[in-house]
A protein has these predicted regions:
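Acetyl-CoA-dependent GNAT
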Residues: 3, 12-92, 97-98, 110-112, ...
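A generic structural signal for beta-strand entry/edge sites
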Residues: 86-88, 124, 161
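Conserved catalytic-core motifs of GNAT/GCN5-like acyltransferases
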Residues: 21, 49, 126-131, 137-163
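Active-site acidic-Proline motif in GNAT/NAT acetyltransferases
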Residues: 97-103, 131
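Loop/helix-junction capping segments adjacent to catalytic residues or to phosphate/diphosphate-binding pockets
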Residues: 24, 103, 134
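Conserved G/P- and acidic residue-centered "switch" motifs that form tight phosphate/ATP-binding loops
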Residues: 73, 104, 121
Length: 173
């Protein structure tokens, strides 16, 4: 499935494809994410890579999915979602390749994930980032996400969870 978007001028050729964690398009993004987690939080990339994949059943349609943003055949950004509760999707593994940052691709990815989850009937998005990811915090703050208390999730070593939500519909009750 290809998802059209109306990206900023720098990303006119970015297109989104549905994938799985085992997809060759997802592998370089997950490997780089594991490397960066190791740099920011400690541990080894292989340790982080062992827990990064979300169980495939949780990403299966209609409840979940993984979108990879591809530019000229190269995966540059990606993110997943899974059912959190009856009206909420949880965003997971939001990532943009280091070589493609500061070009608006993460914002375009969030817009694509928001459109896809809304089309699947979700009314709210929830996500957790870590205290050593200020770029992610800034992205979510700038794109209309609101900080909320994290559901019970213990801190792990240097990782302190920071939770965000965004309502996709204005008529929430």
């Amino acid at each position: 499935m290809v998802h059209p978007s109306s990206p900023p001028a720098a990303s006119q050729q970015l297109r989104f494809v549905s994938a799985t964690h085992n997809d060759p398009l997802a592998q370089p993004l997950l490997a780089e994410l594991a490397d960066e987690y190791a740099q920011r939080y400690g541990g080894t990339p292989s340790t982080h890579l062992s827990w990064l994949p979300v169980p495939q059943a949780e990403l299966a349609a209609p409840d979940g999915g993984l979108l990879i943003g591809v530019l000229d055949g190269v995966p540059v950004t990606g993110g997943a979602f899974r059912r959190y509760d009856s009206e909420t999707a949880e965003l997971k593994r939001i990532w943009t390749d280091r070589a493609y940052r500061r070009r608006g691709y993460a914002r375009v990815l969030l817009a694509a994930l928001e459109a896809e989850t809304a089309a699947r009937g979700y009314r709210r998005l929830y996500l957790i980032t870590g205290n050593r990811q200020p770029e992610a915090e800034a992205l979510y703050d700038a794109t209309g996400y609101t900080r909320v208390p994290a559901d019970p999730l213990p801190s792990w070593g240097p990782f302190v969870p920071i939770a965000f939500e965004k309502w996709l519909v204005a008529d929430r009750e």
